[in-house]
Amino acid sequence: MIGYISDNILLPILDFFYGLVPSYGLAIVALTVVIRLALFPLSAGSIRSARRMRIAQPAMKKRQDEIKSRYAKDPQKQQEELGKVMKEFGNPLSGCLPLLVQMPILFALFATLRGSPFADVPYLVNLKVLPSDQIAAIEPKPFTSSKHSIFISETKHFPVIASLPSGTKLGVGDKAQIKLQTLTGESFTSRLSGVEGGTKFTPTWSVTKGDDLVKVSADGTVQALAEGDATVQGKIPGLAAQSGFLFIKALGQVGFYVDGEINWDIAILVGGFGLTLLVSQILSGRGLPANPQQSTANKITPVMITGMFLFFPLPAGVLLYMVIANIFQAGQTFLLSREALPENLQKILNDQLSKPALATEAIGGSDRLPFEPKKRSK
């Protein structure tokens, strides 16, 4: 499903925006905004549900505990009363369905930005080398990899797979060629003939595991040297992997610290992701009673995730998408936090905020945002 969404929905949208303004950086921004706008109703439902459940949860839990205690010996009546409470306050899991529906689209968007044209596309083939006297008894099972759409120009792309007709099991001393080809069986290199600058898409081959067990030549031919498990990788360069955007040196660049040097563009993107995530989480609790555990999680989570992405190998184009998506999410959360609540929930919230301890500790209980300076008292 993810591949279908990427090839038939996201890539055509990407082609459209690149046709309007020939900048892959702007195309990423536009694609992110369009997808987020399309998913707005679903994500808004999740945000509303989370906000309402956070308000209702204390009163809801109190009612549920009372019912369980009162009707402990009458399970049927207990379930009936619990159902009434659920109907009054809403199902805590109701916000999960919109989130689950949009996940395939978000995963497809993520996968699209990790592939061609924004990054080099790897094809991994796991091989098993057996003794030469055993391989004869094994029936060959042809291998084909997952397909990836490869851009060979700004608007021309097609799916490419890796194929090994003799299968992934080789005998010591055997040779086999891994072929990169289209779904119709046409060689990838033959599709490059006649393409201006086509040589820059020539695949490179390497052994990523077990380099003492197999070796691979420039045309993808593998020779088995010794028994064991090995992995061979073929990599097709991304068309826009070296294209820059604003302060980003290359959209396909990976890594915060590479070859002894800090990539400051990656550092800025990761820092921007952490900051926008923090703002979004602060806004999600605006005007609600303080929850010490939630407040601590809101502060720690962005720091942990940001630290992880400093060393997680994500291309700059993917990080750009994540920052733009977080900005959109923060704006959406701010707007929804100003929506009127149902009468019963508003009454519960007013009661919660009327308590001195909660009122003084409420997160964003006033109109002032958490990051705005306090007004001076007269």
Swiss-Prot record:
The chain crosses the membrane at residues 20-42, 93-113, 264-284, 304-324. Pfam families: 60KD_IMP. CDD domains: 5TM_YidC_Alb3. The keyword Transmembrane applies. Keywords: Cell inner membrane, Cell membrane, Chaperone, Membrane, Protein transport, Transmembrane, Transmembrane helix, Transport. This is Membrane protein insertase YidC. It comes from the Bacteria. Belongs to the OXA1/ALB3/YidC family. Type 1 subfamily. It comes from Prochlorococcus marinus (strain MIT 9313). GO terms for molecular function: membrane insertase activity. It is found in: Cell inner membrane. Interacts with the Sec translocase complex via SecD. Specifically interacts with transmembrane segments of nascent integral membrane proteins during membrane integration. The gene is yidC. Its main location: membrane. Required for the insertion and/or proper folding and/or complex formation of integral membrane proteins into the membrane. Involved in integration of membrane proteins that insert both dependently and independently of the Sec translocase complex, as well as at least some lipoproteins. Aids folding of multispanning membrane proteins. One of its GO terms (cellular component) is plasma membrane. It is a multi-pass membrane protein. GO terms for biological process: protein insertion into membrane; protein transport.
